[in-house]
Design a protein with these regions (language model features):
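Flexible, compositionally biased loop and terminal segments
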Residues: 1-150
Length: 150
């Protein structure tokens, strides 16, 4: 019989639902570096980060959080290679389309902050559409910050 137990996952801490914060903000940073450290393309890190954010957003909605803000793409991010920027824009499009398909059920409201004008026109239109569809919903408000900074 081994002396040490196999490494076990620590149990998730209990959530005190009587003392939840009203607002949580997340800065999407380090996903490309995370991928590079694992020998993966930076775009794989962005995809993993987007999926992790979706998991977090779902949890926040489920526990009744009022506001969730994600700083997703800053003005500095335009300096990245065009392929990487394109991949990030593609991920944003993918997740917004998925969000739209679930909005009525989830009652999530989405707002967008930052200068959206440099984004591809299709993405600008999708942001406006998402905002319009969700404007009357009363669930968690997800604020997406795009092309912010200065």
């Amino acid at each position: 019989m081994p002396f040490f137990k196999a490494k076990e996952q620590a149990p998730a801490p209990a959530v005190d639902f009587d003392h939840l914060p009203r607002h949580i903000a997340i800065i999407m940073d380090g996903n490309g570096r995370w991928a590079q450290k694992r020998g993966l393309p930076r775009t794989a890190g962005h995809a993993a980060g987007a999926e992790n954010f979706r998991t977090i957003a779902t949890y926040c909605k489920d526990i009744g959080l009022e506001y969730l803000t994600v700083y997703a793409f800053s003005t500095e991010n335009w300096k990245r290679p065009a392929e990487e920027v394109g991949a990030i824009m593609g991920l944003l499009k993918k997740y917004l389309l998925e969000a739209i398909s679930r909005m009525e059920r989830d009652r999530v409201k989405m707002e967008f902050f930052g200068d959206l004008s440099p984004l591809p026109q299709e993405l600008q239109d999708l942001c406006r559409r998402t905002r319009e569809i969700s404007k009357g919903y009363d669930g968690c408000q997800v604020n997406v910050c795009l092309n912010y900074g200065g």
